[in-house]
Structure formats: structure tokens, C-alpha cells
Amino acid sequence: MLSPANAKNQRLVSLEDVGVLRGGRWLVRGVEFSVSRGEIVTLIGPNGSGKSTSAKAAIGVLKPDEGRVERLSGLKVGYVPQKLSIDWTLPLTVRRLMTLTGPLPERDMQAALEAAGIAHMIGAEVQHLSGGEFQRALMARAIARKPDLLVLDEPVQGVDFSGEIALYHLIKSIRNASGCGILLISHDLHVVMAETDTVICLNGHVCCRGTPEAVSRSPEYVRLFGSRAAQTLAVYSHHHDHTHLPDGRVLHADGSVTDHCHPEDGHHAHDSQEHAHGQDHVHAHEHSHDDHHGHDHAHEHAHSRSGEGRHA
């Protein structure tokens, strides 16, 4: 256990060489990262890459089969799931949603809803909320009990571009107001929240890590989407020293092929290096669009997504 303290930048959770084995197959292996108080860490990768698995291992929902996870003693976690099973035919108000996991003082409920910008919707039925409003309700539910660590599993899914910007702005506000650490999971491989301190690209292991390039540096992006978008979103450029083959094996830069990519095999040096918080570690080069188990990465950026849809 990590020792309790109130200092800013205090480490909340740390993963060291973590692996999760299920059905004779490694879902993730050799995963290393940490989240400190006031820090935002974003996990990106294709579907099935181990993002949610790694996050669940970090907060103790999954027990790793190898490696070590250390957490702050008495760590309080707020969790916004990727999907929430709700019977939409039954009436469920925002107020009731806030107390599904237990009673909550009225003052704390009101404060959380106010922080999420939906205090006026406390009596609304959740099935009538838009995608963005529902995500705000889930976020209010997660922060109501004042967590040290906030885990957000694809929080901007089902919202349009402007809604995505607004939600990222909300996440930033929550971090600034509470000082909590944030572990954010995203399926978007190239466009991430600009306030992210560290981006970690996963595909069964840590493929690369670094800091995002601020979109605000691109005049074209600012002209197209405005300064608020430029201040909220950022571009992350990948640097992989290996290629994932269609059969799941890994082709390394030296021409060798292995069944997986693991720090101990000597091919993946940067996995074992701890990324310094705040260090400028941007990898600028073209990202191969078919290097993750044969998945096609050529997907639309955030600005070309369809309009706001229903929540999951």
C-alpha cells in the first residue's frame, strides 16, 4: 500500500509489470503506469486492447496474475462505466440514479449535480436525457462521494463534437476543483483531452507512451473548430517499435517475431521506463493504421463523428 498523504502529486495507484491471464491467453502483460493526485492519464487503444482490463486491475476489480499493483491506503475511487445496465422502460430519475449504490446526503448530491451542470435536472427521468446529459449524470454520481481517483471509461461516447468538448471541459473543472487523479479510457487513437499529462497506448501491452501535442499549435484546427476546441482536445502521435501481425504475433524492428511483446524479451525497452510527469515526450511520426492485430485504425477524428446519439 502507498502511504497516505495530502501532498499534491501524491501517487494514488501504481502498476508494475502487470499481466492478466484468462482462458490461457494474456489479456494484458507487462503493463506499467501510475496515476498521481491532480494528474490525468489517458489509456488509448483499439477494441480488445486491454484498456478496461488494465483500469480494473488498477482499482482492484481484477486481480493480476503477475506483477504488482500498489494503491494509496484508503483510496476512494469514483467510476463511470462504459455501459450501465438500466431497464429504460422503468421510471428512473436523476435523483434515484445518484443513490443506486447507497444513500447520499442531499447537500453532497446537490453539490455534485451542480458541479456537473445538471442540478436543474434532478427530477428528470434518465431515459429522456441526451447522451451528453446522461454522461454528466454518471459523472455527478461518481464525484458525489469525493473520490481520490476518478476512472472514466470512454466518457464521451454517444455525444457529438460540441458535447465532447463540453465533457472534457467538465473533467478538467472537476480535476481542478477537487485535485483528484483521473484515469481516462478512450477508443480514439489520435485525438485526446488536451489536459492529459500522459497518454498510454495499449494493445495487450504498452505500445508507446508520451504527452499529447496541443491542438492549439495548429492554426488550421483553430480556424476550423474554434479556440475552445483547440484548448480542450489534443493530437497524440504514436511511436511503435513493433508491428502486430494478423495472427496475433509481434514483428520487432530487428526482424524477429515473438508470440507477444513483453519487457523481458529485450525488444521493448520503453515499456520498462517510467514516464516522467510533465516531461515533453511527444513522438512525431506516421502511425501505422494496421499494426494492432490487423485492426484498421483509419477512423474518423472526433470532429467527423455523427451527431449526438443515445447513451449506451
Swiss-Prot record:
EC number: 7.2.2.20
Name assigned to this protein: Zinc import ATP-binding protein ZnuC
PANTHER family hit by this protein: METAL TRANSPORT SYSTEM ATP-BINDING PROTEIN TM_0124-RELATED, ZINC IMPORT ATP-BINDING PROTEIN ZNUC
Superkingdom of this protein's organism: Bacteria
Top-level enzyme category: translocase
The entry's keywords: ATP-binding, Cell inner membrane, Cell membrane, Ion transport, Membrane, Nucleotide-binding, Translocase, Transport, Zinc, Zinc transport
Residues bound to ATP: G45, P46, N47, G48, S49, G50, K51, S52
Family: Belongs to the ABC transporter superfamily. Zinc importer (TC 3.A.1.15.5) family.
GO molecular function: ABC-type zinc transporter activity; ATP binding; ATP hydrolysis activity
Gene symbol of the encoding locus: znuC
Annotated localization: Cell inner membrane
Topological type in the membrane: Peripheral membrane protein
